[in-house]
């Protein structure tokens, strides 16, 4: 009698649930996965090599394009590595602004995750809800940097500029008349901090809406509970970080365990899962959204009370103000040297890691004393998680592979780099 061979199926790279350009070669016994082999590299853009040909400051926009859903957090790790090499002190106001925008970015990421994860599993409404909130947060990005996504707002020594006192206003168009525009601009009459505060007051009710739609939903639980289970020991052995590790019951968060910037002054909790399955990771991320909202509120209160500089006064690292540059020859020279030659970073090496929405995102920078990095290594959290896909998917159905890819929160910009 002939042997029955396993069936090989190509999943992706142009599959709607593949989260970008994932190609999975699945070995199937009927509908059960025997082996899942991820093929990566389809979004490789040689970021680490490109950084070696650019000055230290010119590489900041490349960081936005790594995990293109969590833009400012990527920048944060990079500028922290430069600051460690330079031994720079960042003004306290800039630290609070960075922490606030890190958490806004965490919300952006988790909303994208919950929307696309639910859409993959078959719940479309949450996707539309999540993008309604993301629109407000893109406006926050736009107010400080001029860009909705790729902000390039963090700079070595601080941030590009202080928070604006006014918000961009909508104008009447063919789509929206004067009456509609008046309603849309209601929350935009004050400063950016007023706009963010208004959003943080509304946001908990939005999270309640997502939970109403999903948390006790029978179909959602059937698709997530006991799928992709990872034990705490295995999660550590495979190098998991972030919600993937906390979902397995290990309380590890760089914001608490190795605090950077002003996280040690913040009051927040670390949500931890119990079962290590997709449902536990879902609950962890939903609670993380609530905790991020708490941190943003604390930052708003502090920033209202404490004006001050937002970037270092050292003009060999940060450009002088435009007013000074146009009236003072020395400042003009500083400006010219900074944007032509860049910063000469002392020889040495530094590793800076941040608690990225997906896990531990690290930048290992080596300087040989020149104005460009000698070597830049990017530690992407998603790379480790994708490597565990085979183990997590084995023995499950094809439909469950989609759920597992969703729970890993994979973005290929950072994996392929």
Swiss-Prot record:
It comes from the Bacteria. It catalyses: a quinone + NADH + 5 H(+)(in) = a quinol + NAD(+) + 4 H(+)(out). The keyword Lyase does not apply. Its EC number is 7.1.1.-. Coiled coil: none annotated. It is found in: Cell inner membrane. One of its GO terms (molecular function) is quinone binding. Its main location: membrane. It is an enzyme of class 7 (translocase). The keyword Mitochondrion does not apply. InterPro entries: NADH_Q_OxRdtase_suD, NADH_UbQ_OxRdtase_49kDa_CS, NDH1_su_D/H, NiFe-Hase_large. GO terms for cellular component: plasma membrane. It holds the Pfam family Complex1_49kDa. Keywords: Cell inner membrane, Cell membrane, Membrane, NAD, Quinone, Translocase, Transport, Ubiquinone. It is a peripheral membrane protein. NDH-1 shuttles electrons from NADH, via FMN and iron-sulfur (Fe-S) centers, to quinones in the respiratory chain. The immediate electron acceptor for the enzyme in this species is believed to be ubiquinone. Couples the redox reaction to proton translocation (for every two electrons transferred, four hydrogen ions are translocated across the cytoplasmic membrane), and thus conserves the redox energy in a proton gradient. NDH-1 is composed of 14 different subunits. Subunits NuoB, C, D, E, F, and G constitute the peripheral sector of the complex. Belongs to the complex I 49 kDa subunit family. This is NADH-quinone oxidoreductase subunit D.
């Amino acid at each position: 009698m002939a042997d029955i061979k396993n069936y090989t199926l190509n999943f992706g790279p142009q599959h709607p649930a593949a989260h970008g350009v994932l190609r999975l070669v699945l070995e199937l016994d009927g509908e059960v996965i025997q082996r899942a082999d991820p093929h990566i590299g389809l979004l490789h853009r040689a970021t680490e090599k490109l950084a070696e040909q650019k000055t230290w400051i010119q590489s900041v926009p490349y960081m936005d394009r790594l995990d293109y859903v969590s833009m400012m957090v990527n920048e944060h790790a990079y500028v922290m590595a430069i600051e460690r090499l330079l031994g720079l002190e960042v003004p306290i106001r800039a630290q609070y602004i960075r922490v606030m925008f890190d958490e806004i970015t965490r919300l952006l990421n988790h909303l994208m995750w919950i929307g696309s994860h639910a859409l993959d599993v078959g719940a479309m409404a949450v996707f539309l809800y999540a993008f309604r909130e993301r629109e407000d947060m893109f406006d926050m990005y736009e107010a400080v940097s001029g860009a909705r996504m790729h902000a390039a707002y963090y700079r070595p020594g601080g941030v590009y500029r202080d928070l604006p006192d006014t918000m961009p206003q909508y104008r009447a168009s063919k789509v929206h008349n004067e009456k509609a525009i008046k309603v849309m601009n209601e929350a935009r009459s004050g400063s950016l901090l007023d706009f963010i505060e208004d959003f943080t007051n509304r946001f908990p009710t939005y999270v309640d809406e997502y939970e109403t739609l999903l948390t006790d939903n029978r179909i959602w639980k059937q698709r997530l509970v006991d799928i992709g289970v990872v034990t705490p020991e295995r999660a550590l052995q495979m190098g998991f970080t972030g919600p993937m590790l906390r979902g397995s019951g290990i309380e590890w968060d760089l914001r608490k365990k190795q605090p950077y910037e002003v996280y040690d002054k913040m009051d927040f909790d670390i949500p931890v899962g119990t079962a290590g399955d997709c449902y536990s990771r879902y609950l962890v991320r939903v609670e993380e959204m609530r905790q991020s909202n708490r941190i943003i509120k604390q930052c708003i209160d502090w920033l209202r009370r404490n004006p001050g500089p937002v970037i270092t006064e050292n003009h060999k690292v940060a450009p002088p103000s435009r007013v000074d540059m146009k009236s003072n020859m020395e400042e003009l020279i500083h400006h010219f040297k900074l944007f032509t030659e860049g910063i000469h970073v002392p020889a040495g090496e530094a590793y800076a890691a941040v608690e990225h929405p997906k896990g531990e995102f690290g930048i290992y920078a080596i300087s040989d004393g020149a104005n460009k990095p000698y070597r830049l290594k990017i530690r992407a959290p998603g790379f480790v998680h994708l490597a565990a896909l085979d183990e997590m998917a084995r023995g499950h159905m094809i439909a469950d592979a989609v759920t597992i890819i969703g729970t890993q929160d994979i973005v290929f910009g950072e994996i392929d780099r």
